[in-house]
From Swiss-Prot:
A motif (Cell attachment site) lies at residues 86-88, 137-139, 181-183, 587-589, 593-595, 716-718, 980-982, 992-994, 1144-1146. The kidneys of transgenic mice where the 5' portions of both COL4A3 and COL4A4 and the shared intergenic promoter region were deleted exhibit morphological and ultrastructural features characteristic of the human hereditary disorder Alport syndrome, including disorganization and multilamellar structure of the GBM and delayed onset glomerulonephritis. Glycans are attached at residues 43, 134, 661. Residues 969-978 have a biased composition (Gly residues). Residues 57-1451 are annotated as: Triple-helical region. GO terms for biological process: glomerular basement membrane development. Residues 31-56 are annotated as: 7S domain. GO terms for cellular component: basement membrane; collagen type IV trimer; collagen-containing extracellular matrix; extracellular region. SUPFAM superfamilies: C-type lectin-like (SSF56436). The gene is Col4a4. Keywords: Basement membrane, Collagen, Disulfide bond, Extracellular matrix, Glycoprotein, Hydroxylation, Repeat, Secreted, Signal. Alpha chains of type IV collagen have a non-collagenous domain (NC1) at their C-terminus, frequent interruptions of the G-X-Y repeats in the long central triple-helical domain (which may cause flexibility in the triple helix), and a short N-terminal triple-helical 7S domain. This is Collagen alpha-4(IV) chain.
Length: 1682
């Protein structure tokens, strides 16, 4: 137990444990990559020296941005995002194209009576009617209204003079106020009758209007007839007027004198007629008595006709009148409807044939003989992919190209000691490997730590291969500011307003302004001066006649007075209008300059527009202030461009070395003591039951087994117990050689003979023998050392017990066992060191069936099933209406296989095949003749370091100078990736390197390459013979899937497909089949197109050695050789002086690119980037060359970046110590030491030196010598030194030419099925397949659309004689022939007529195809055919008058093309009603929802019956030419069957029984639904028949607030069965269907007619089905019955 803990402790604390842990971490983080070679490619034979790590260098400059990486692999499908917000309504789309003509609608119900129309226009003048009888005398009319007063009469005769009035003394009277108007005079006679007015329409009586203003008096009327009335009596005196105002007092003399009356003056001239006065007010009514009624006047002239009165009531039916005269002949009527088909007429007369018209096509002739084999046709379309190929082994392939040189072999055994007295001979050929020696005695115990003296620095090695990528480095320092080539950003917001500007200088005078608008009126002006006297006015109108003045007594006539004084000034007049604007004045003089001493600053102006961006200013000084807190981490930047190569780093510090006492093997020692017991091993198979426990006798030693393949070196073990001290070796101890790099594993050696034979002389290398027979199966090798533990696999199924294994070889005798009691079980040990993976075991027996796994995800849609058996022939349908010329049909099924074609042209030589499998080793060949000397071979790979040889003879003391430098060694193995180094300083730009070699093929397949250019077109095939044109058939329904055709010729290469998903692992093959017999040679194929270049193949095996070449030209000087073996150590020299530092070397060239790295694991998805600003469209660049341009010059180094934040601690534990730095340059040589002792001459003059003494303890390290000066160049005369150890690997050579192909190996066994590869390119189209068997006859297609108008038909046969008795014959005049009318549209087909004595019937339906006959020999060419029958007569003449309708035909009419849809609401297809052919069946689609919007289907239209069911029968496409399917939560809703509601969503086959089936039938008329809104079944209208009764289904909603409804006229609104959940929701993306809680169906309810307009309905909840059905309205679907 204690030992165990000690062991565990030593294991955990040993440095190997750290390596072990790191190895597992490396395995974890590196996706399990292993590095070839022991110890992961490191040199384990040297002591591990771990120098301290140097201080961190300055950060290098930021490298240029790397190129954009290749397109990453397609990421995994993301989880569905949350439901997006509802998008804005889209803009209305463009108007769609005009749709097709819809089907004929159902005849509508009669409309409501229209409103009476407007009165029509007056008819033409009628003929004069017959004179009527005199009418009876009418009743007297009502008295008319009072007429208007007549005009004033003429003045009467003058009256007689009255009596003289009395004289009056007037004392200044005034004119009195006008008296009241007198009474009106008597009415005048009526005027003459005016002209007849046009009659007005009869208006409604209006309300009385308001009184209008008094109009101006009219002009006087015409003079009336002279009145004959008598003078009336004088009226009574008027009333006394009011008192007038007092007048001015006139002094009149009193009448003391007598006044004389003057003489009557002369009558004045009549005055001018005054203007008419204003009309007087209406007078009071007169007082006269009403006169008697006058006698009736003469009849007036005939009035104009009145307007149309309202229509009268209908009169009684009159007596039948006498027959009228025959009318005139009318115009020709339009062409009548087509009558029913008449009886067949008598045969027509044979006319002379019209030559140009072509005859009617004849009946099809008998089948012709087989023609000769035609020319090879063009390649057919690509066939379907063929079945997977057989898994038998193929024939032996051609020899592959030579393989890559093998790995270096293991170190050879030590050679035989050379003779001490001979000069060194040529190096011998390598001997056969010796037997393993016996174990030596144990050496002395080693000290814990051995110090090595540091060796001399070796020459600078070549650059090693690029190692695998290192772990991710720490976060780098913050980069310098990048150059911004971004476009300028958007314009910023306006800045703050600037300070007010200084006062500007005075501006120039402006141009004169426009005229201003009219100003407001001014204030009233001051009083103006009096104006000048006006001109005399025009003559005024004459005044009214004055009244007669009173008599004035005047004595004297006065003189004319003088002019009076001016009157007082008048009042100011009104304002005059404003005057017009004046003309602009002349320009004034400039005014004096203003004073701005005390001017206040103006108000702040508006902010100015932003100025253009300024030029970049110089960089400002650093700002003040403390540095702010570090900002949040920014988004990851774009990857930078790859930097140019940096300068080489400075030389590292010298590392410490550990001295290794290398001891060489002594004689074989005694056997060592038993080691401590090992760790507990893995449990072995159960052994056979043991005997009792007495010790057994020691067995005999077994024969040595064959040496196994050495396993990889194990981890370093604990220090062993000290062994027995060995005897002193005989060899003098040489100085330690430089450590060699470990060689790769050599090939397995031939087992030596157990007897110790001397090694024989090596033979010449033989030529490769012919391939040998396959050897027997070899014995199993010894088990290798344990490999690392594999990743635990998933537990397999339990297999049955295996067969008993064969008995193993006897083991090595074990140590004697201890007492036989069984010990207590130990604590479980630590996990053992990893073992190597074992060979794959034989395939196990098939295990027991496992438990059922969880349901997998829904699979892809399966392949179409096998074709069903052909159904029975259906009844023959009625002939369809002739359809239009159909479009080109679908491509036909492949025909029967044709006879084999003629051999094609020889193909171009194919590409080189992939290397074949390794051949079995051949028999040993006989020794060939010696070949010519070959050229100097390439340097071989470095061999493993051999064991130290015995000391050779002392050489002749030839004072040789330093040898030429040795050849460069092969490249070393790639090391582990080191920690990320510190950033180096930036290097100068190197020259462009040579192109690197092709890298090894990557582990993962790269993205598909760009399509290559298309190959040259193949030669054109010979033209095929043209076929006869067939009759275009109706488009059939799609037939069953035919048998697969034979493969077509290769098609054109398709675009590379997207990479398919990884296939499932196939079942292992049971065992290899024997190779099949050799097939017949195929016929040469067509010339293929140039294929897509294949991926680069793996290197093939090494081919046989070619014949020796002719001696070549002598090669150029080789590279200097390796340094020679170290000489004996000289005496220690004096320390030299310190040398000057050497000049700095130039930067080296760029290295070649390393091999492609292993593809890393998928990174986690990055954050979404911000939306970039929209860039401006760039100009199109010139197309670049195909190659990349040379890299640009290196930019100036940027400023040093700011110090970055400290990184978070890394995940990994501290890494391994870095590798030792490169050796420094050699120092100058020290001064020469004193001469050594003279060496022994070859002639034996000097005695042998004594044996060397024991070695003393190592002295302390001396101070480091000063490098000596460089030596002088050696002489060429002297001997060249022995070849030194191989140097470090040289640069990789250029790639050699491919070797010749190797021998063909036997076919290998079938491998297990590989994993499914990526999707291949589509194959080239195969040759045309065999013709398939003819399909079964399809169902009759639906009637096609109405075809175009056909050519004019032949003239019909004469019809039957008309029925003379039914109509009276009125002979008509012959009509004038009308002009030729346009060609009429094709009429509807007539009803089917009576069967006539028919001519030959139409050919019946095609019979089933007979078996192919034997092809006959070609017959002789036929005779020339007879002349065809006469063609049709010419175009028809102009149409005659409309014929009488024909007699009614017999038989059923053709169907009309109306469609009827039936939904069964079960999973059974419904049957069509009798007499209605079924067009198709399908599944009942109710509506679909896409993008959260529903689109409803009317269940009465054929679109609701989809022939194929899918949970998502649609995709959606956008304007970017991209379509998406099953990318959103789109849904479809289907009518459901009566299956019980499921608990879980339905998927796959479960769905079928829940979807209602439907059928589409052709009906003779349109069907409509009628609804009762109560529990009774509503009756169909008269002459309509019932199709089904049901329940009134109104509308439905599903997910969200979306849904639809049924038109109540549509048969879809009458479902035969009522269900609360009549439909099911299918979620397209999941492929499942379910009845969800948010599905609602809406049904018309029953309504009591008495409660139609009553208060609101009473709420109710119905849970029982019968109660629900009683509440739902009933309906019936009816169709017009003709």
């Amino acid at each position: 137990m204690r030992c165990f803990f000690r062991w565990t402790k030593s294991f955990v604390t040993a440095p190997w444990s750290l390596i072990f842990i790191l190895f597992t971490i490396q395995y974890e983080y590196g996706s399990g990559k292993k590095y070839g070679g022991p110890c992961g490619g490191r040199n384990c034979s040297v002591c591990q020296c771990f120098p301290e790590k140097g201080s961190r260098g300055h950060p290098g400059p930021l490298g240029p941005q790397g190129p954009i990486g290749p397109l990453g692999p397609l990421g995994p499908i993301g989880i569905p995002g949350e439901k997006g917000e509802r998008g804005d309504s889209g803009s209305p789309g463009p108007p769609g194209e005009k749709g097709d003509k819809g089907p004929t609608g159902v005849p509508g119900f009669p409309g409501v009576d229209g409103v009476p129309g407007h009165p029509g226009p007056p008819g033409p003048r009628g003929k004069p009617g017959v004179d009527g009888y005199n009418g009876s005398r009418g009743d007297p009319g009502y008295p008319g209204e009072r007429g208007a007063p007549g005009p004033g009469g003429p003045p009467g005769q003058p009256g007689e003079n009255g009596e003289k009035g009395r004289s009056v003394y007037i004392t200044g009277g005034v004119k009195g106020i006008q008296g009241d108007r007198g009474d009106p005079g008597p009415p005048g006679l009526p005027g003459s009758r005016g002209a007849q007015g046009s009659p007005g329409p009869m208006g409604h009586a209006g309300a009385p209007g308001l009184a209008g203003p008094i109009g101006h008096p009219g002009s006087p009327g015409l003079k009336g007839n002279p009145a004959t009335g008598l003078k009336g009596q004088r009226g009574e005196p008027g009333e006394v007027g009011q008192r007038g105002p007092p007048g001015p007092t006139l002094l009149v003399q009193p009448p003391d004198l007598s006044i004389y009356k003057g003489e009557k003056g002369v009558k004045g001239m009549p005055g001018m007629i005054g203007p008419p006065g204003p009309p007087g007010r209406k007078g009071a009514p007169g007082v006269g008595i009403k006169g008697e009624k006058g006698i009736p006047g003469f009849p007036g002239p005939r009035g104009e006709p009145g307007s149309h009165g309202p229509p009268g009531f209908p009169g009684f039916k009159g007596i039948q009148g006498a027959a009228g005269e025959p009318g005139l002949f009318g115009f020709l009527g339009p062409k009548g409807d087509l009558g029913d088909r008449g009886y067949p007429g008598p045969p027509g007369i044979l006319l002379t044939p019209a030559p140009p018209l072509k005859g009617v096509p004849g009946d099809p002739g008998p089948p012709g003989y087989y023609g000769e084999i035609g020319d090879v046709g063009l390649p057919g379309p690509p066939g379907p992919p063929g079945r997977p190929g057989e898994t038998c082994p193929g024939m032996m392939g051609p020899p592959g190209p030579p393989g890559v040189p093998g790995p270096p072999g293991f170190p050879g055994e030590a050679g035989v000691p050379g003779r001490l007295d001979c000069a060194p001979g040529k190096p011998g050929k390598p001997g056969l490997p010796g037997l393993p020696g016996a174990p030596g005695p144990e050496g002395p115990p080693g000290s814990d730590v051995i110090y090595c003296r540091p060796g001399c620095p070796g020459p600078m090695g070549e650059k090693g291969k690029v190692g695998p990528p290192g772990r991710r480095g720490a976060k780098g320092a913050k980069g310098n500011k990048g150059l911004c080539t971004c476009p300028p950003g958007p314009m910023g917001p306006p800045g703050p307003p600037g300070p007010p500007g200084r006062q500007g200088s005075k501006g120039d005078l402006g141009l004169p302004g426009w005229h201003g608008e009219k100003g407001d009126p001014g204030q009233p002006g001051a009083e103006g001066p009096p104006g000048p006297p006006g001109r005399p006015g025009a003559m005024g109108p004459p005044g009214h006649k004055g009244e007669k003045g009173d008599m004035v007594i005047s004595r004297v006539k006065g003189q004319k007075g003088e002019r009076g004084l001016d009157g007082p000034p008048g009042f100011p007049g009104p304002h005059g209008q404003d005057g017009g604007d004046g003309r602009p004045g002349e320009r004034g003089d400039p005014g004096p300059r203003g004073d701005h001493k005390d001017a206040a600053p103006g108000e702040r102006g508006l902010p100015g527009l932003p100025g253009p961006p300024g030029r970049t200013g110089p960089e400002g000084p650093p700002g003040l202030g403390f540095p702010g807190p570090p900002g949040q981490r920014g988004l990851p930047g774009e990857p930078g461009r790859p930097g140019t190569r940096g300068f080489d780093g400075t030389k590292g510090q010298k590392g410490d070395s550990i001295l290794c006492n290398v001891s060489y093997p002594g004689k074989p020692g005694l056997p060592g003591l038993d080691g401590p017991p090992g760790l507990k091993g893995f449990p072995g198979p159960p052994g056979a039951p043991g005997m009792r426990c007495p010790d057994g006798q020691k067995g005999q030693r077994g024969k040595p087994g064959m040496s196994g393949i050495p396993g990889p070196p194990g981890f370093r073990g604990d220090m062993g117990d000290p062994g027995i001290k060995g005897e002193k070796g005989t060899s003098p101890i040489g100085p330690p050689g430089p450590p060699g790099s470990p060689g790769k594993d050599g090939q397995k050696g031939i087992p030596g003979d157990p007897a110790f034979g001397d090694p024989g002389p090596p033979g010449e290398r033989g030529l490769p023998g012919a391939p040998g027979m396959k050897g027997q199966k070899g014995h199993p090798g010894c088990p290798g050392a344990g490999g690392p533990p594999g990743i635990p696999g998933s537990p397999g199924l339990k297999g049955p017990k295996g067969r008993e294994g064969s008995r193993g070889f006897p083991g090595i005798p074990g140590s004697p066992g201890h007492s036989c009691e069984r010990g207590a079980p130990g604590i479980p040990g630590q996990p053992g060191l990893p073992g190597t993976p074992g060979d794959p075991g034989a395939p196990g027996w098939k295990g027991q069936p496992g438990d059922m796994g969880p349901s997998g995800p829904a699979g892809m849609k399966g392949l179409p099933g096998l074709p069903g058996l052909p159904g029975a022939d259906g009844l023959r349908g009625p002939p369809g209406i002739p359809g239009p010329n159909g479009e080109d049909g679908l491509p036909g099924l492949p025909g029967l296989k044709g006879l084999p074609g003629l051999p094609g042209f020889p193909g171009f030589p194919g590409e080189r095949g992939k290397p074949g499998p390794d051949g079995e080793p051949g028999r040993k060949g006989e020794v060939g003749e010696k070949g010519w000397p070959g050229l100097k071979g390439d340097l071989g790979e470095r061999g493993a370091k051999g064991d130290r040889g015995l000391p050779g003879d002392a050489g002749e003391a030839v004072t040789s100078r330093k040898g030429e430098p040795g050849d460069a060694g092969p490249p070393g193995d790639g090391g582990f990736s080191g920690e990320r180094g510190d950033k180096g300083s930036s290097g100068m730009r190197g020259g462009r390197g040579d192109p690197g070699r092709d890298g090894l093929p990557g582990l993962h397949r790269g993205q598909p390459g760009i399509d290559g250019p298309p190959g040259p077109p193949g030669p054109p095939g010979p033209p095929g013979s043209p076929g006869l044109r067939g009759v275009i058939g109706f488009p059939g329904f799609p037939g069953d899937q035919g048998d697969p055709g034979s493969p077509g010729p290769p098609g054109f290469p398709g675009d590379d497909g997207a990479r398919g998903p990884k296939g499932y692992k196939g079942d292992p093959a049971s065992q290899c089949g024997p190779p099949g017999p050799k097939g017949e040679p195929g016929s040469p194929g067509y010339q293929g197109r140039t294929g897509v270049p294949g991926e680069k193949g793996f290197p093939g095996d090494e081919g046989p050695r070619g014949p020796p070449g002719r001696p070549g030209q002598p090669g150029s000087f080789g590279p200097p050789g390796c340094p020679g073996d170290p000489g004996m150590p000289g005496l220690k020299g004096h320390p030299g002086e310190v040398g000057d530092p050497g000049p700095r070397g130039d930067a080296g060239d760029f290295g070649r690119p390393g091999p492609a790295g292993v593809k890393g694991p998928l990174g986690s998805p990055g954050l979404n980037g911000l939306h970039g600003l929209k860039g401006e469209k760039g100009t199109k660049g010139a197309s670049g060359l195909l190659e990349m341009g040379p890299p640009g010059p290196m930019g100036m180094p940027g400023q040093k970046g700011e110090k970055g934040d400290p990184g978070s601690p890394g995940i990994s534990p501290p890494g391994l110590p870095g590798e030792k730095g490169f050796p420094g340059p050699p120092g100058r040589p020290g001064p020469p030491g004193p001469a050594g002792a003279p060496g022994r001459a070859a002639k034996g003059d000097i005695p042998d030196p004594g044996p060397p003494g024991d070695r003393g303890p190592p002295g302390p390290d001396g101070p480091r010598g000063v490098p000596g000066p460089p030596g002088s160049p050696g002489n060429v005369d002297l001997l060249k030194g022995d070849p030194g150890d191989c140097g470090l690997p040289g640069p990789p050579g250029s790639r050699g030419p491919p070797g010749p192909p190797g021998c063909q190996g036997p076919p290998g066994c079938d491998g297990k099925d590989g994993q499914k590869g990526p999707m291949g390119l589509p194959g080239l189209p195969g040759p045309p397949g065999l013709p398939g068997a003819p399909g079964e006859k399809g169902l009759p297609g639906p009637p096609g659309r109405k075809g175009p108008v056909g050519p004019p038909g032949c003239r019909g046969e004469p019809g039957p004689p008309a029925d003379v008795d039914s109509c009276p014959r009125i002979p008509g005049l012959p009509g004038v022939p009308g002009p030729r009318g346009p060609e009429g549209a094709m009429g509807e087909p007539g009803r089917r007529g009576l069967p006539g004595p028919g001519c030959k019937g139409e050919p019946g339906p095609d019979g089933r195809r007979g078996q192919d006959g034997i092809p006959g020999s070609p017959g002789p060419p036929g005779r020339k055919g007879d002349t065809g029958e006469a063609g049709c007569p010419g175009a028809p003449g102009p149409p005659g008058p409309t014929g009488d309708p024909g007699p009614k035909g017999f038989g059923p009419g053709s169907l009309s093309g109306f469609l009827l849809v039936l939904h069964s609401q079960t999973d059974q297809e419904p049957a069509c009603p009798v007499g209605m052919p079924r067009l198709w069946t399908g599944y009942s689609l109710l509506y679909m929802e896409g993008q959260e919007k529903a689109h409803n289907q009317d269940l009465g239209l054929a679109g609701s019956c989809l022939p194929v069911f899918s949970t998502l029968p649609f995709a959606y496409c956008n304007i970017h030419q991209v379509c998406h399917y099953a990318q959103r939560n789109d849904r479809s809703y289907w009518l459901s069957s009566a299956a019980p509601l499921p608990m879980m969503p339905l998927s796959e086959e479960e769905i079928r029984s829940y979807i209602s089936r439907c059928a589409v039938c052709e009906a003779p008329a349109q069907a409509v639904a009628v609804h009762s809104q109560d529990q009774s079944i509503p009756p169909c209208p008269r002459t309509w028949r019932s199709l089904w009764i049901g329940y009134s289904f109104l509308m439905h909603t599903g997910a969200g607030d979306q849904g639809g409804g049924q038109a109540l006229m549509s048969p879809g609104s009458c479902l035969e069965d009522f269900r609360a959940a009549p439909f099911v929701e299918c979620q397209g993306r999941q492929g499942t269907c379910h009845f969800f809680a948010n599905e609602y169906s809406f049904w018309l309810t029953t309504v009591n007619p008495d409660l139609q307009f009553a208060s609101g309905p009473s709420p109710d909840t119905l849970k029982e089905v019968q109660a629900q059905r009683r509440k739902i309205s009933r309906c019936q679907v009816c169709m017009k019955h003709s």
